[in-house]
Amino acid sequence: MKFPWLLLVKGAASVAAQKPLATSGSGQVLGTFNLEDIINASPLLSFHRDIVKIPSTTDNEYEVGQFIGDFLEQKHFTVEKQSISDSRFNVYAYQGNNSLPDILVTSHIDTVPPFLPYNLDYPILGGGHEFDRQSVLIAGRGTVDAKGSVAAQIFAVLEILEEKPDASIGLLFVVGEEKGGIGMETFSKNPSPSSFHTVIFGEPTGLNLVSGHKGVIGFNIKATGRAAHSGYPWLGKNAISALLPVASFTERLGEIPFQDGGLPSSLKYGNSTVNLGVIQGGVAVNVVPDSAEAIFSVRVAAGTPDESKSIITREVNKFTKNDPNIEVAFYPGGLSPTDLDTDVEGFDIITVNYGTDVPKLAIHGGGDRVVKRYLYGPGSILVAHGEDEALTVGDLEGAVQGYRVLIEKALSRDV
């Protein structure tokens, strides 16, 4: 039996064959055809629209969590709302009493700020171009990262459960991925042995299967100076001036060969990359600044976080000649590169530079049991977090099929 929403999608595709004449200022109407008709005709696209329209920047996920939980309950899932705080919770859903599923399908429901409203558009490609429904562009914060994955995962699971009602699949949608990963860490605190033999993570991968991603560490460099009147700067010591050279040097550590003192690289992930994301200091333009700080994020291509921390500390001290007024401090934790499974045919394989919740999901017990971990999803990371975040109808619908392939492979696994 086919899902009714698949029939609606086919109906929308036939209607969409009309040739567009023009686009309005809102980007919503093409000649006599309204792009919203395509969205309204598809339960998948409508659900995606509904959750994207709900602002859910990190720490403000309550409303979208409620919406997703209610939707899954209407689809006869048992839904647990795992509390993070009074106004934040993970959504964990499964069939009946099967709270320990074999397969876990997961993504995150928080987004980075600022909220950007949902919008539809269509690229006009010139005369004679036939309307292509799959090229309709869906824009807004979270369309890609990661509400595209959330929607596609849910509808892929619904399709499979329609065909195989006894399939042992759970859905987990966590908060806080964009800021520290508290949602996945909270889910992982359950000390009971993990039941799942396969976990499918959703992030924007361009419909490619990811073989791994870099690790990450964060740190700051602080400079201490001496305040003075700006008219007599020689009476003080400018902390910003002291900080800038070492900050610039540190930013280049990923480009320096490892044997020459740089950060590690690997054939799989390439160079480690260093981002100088924040620099701050001083209190007023007429005061010599007595303090300054530079904050860095490193995407680590090889080795452990501690190894990279040692390199950074050593090279900063060497560059500053052990200046006691320049200090390096690392933020707690850090992650090594994460390798993932790619043993499913039909996908292109890539690596990515961004971090995910994958290493934050703890696997408890099980002895030598191998848990497969896959990372896949619609949309490009190159537009995620930006003002032009968007994906196409084709991306979203293609992801449903991709998730189906991954889940079907997991269901056939002999464990």
From Swiss-Prot:
Locations listed in the record: Secreted
Origin superkingdom: Eukaryota
Major site of localization recorded for this protein: secreted
Molecular function in Gene Ontology: metal ion binding; peptidase activity
Glycan-bearing residues: 97, 271
Annotated binding of Zn(2+) 2, by residue: 145
Bilayer-crossing regions: none
Listed cofactors: Zn(2+)
Pfam families named among the record's database cross-references: M20_dimer (PF07687), Peptidase_M20 (PF01546)
Cofactor: binding comment: Binds 2 Zn(2+) ions per subunit.
GO biological process, alphabetically ordered: proteolysis
PANTHER family: ACETYLORNITHINE DEACETYLASE, PEPTIDASE M20 DIMERISATION DOMAIN-CONTAINING PROTEIN
Protein name, as recorded: Probable carboxypeptidase ACLA_013260
Protein source organism: Aspergillus clavatus (strain ATCC 1007 / CBS 513.65 / DSM 816 / NCTC 3887 / NRRL 1 / QM 1276 / 107)
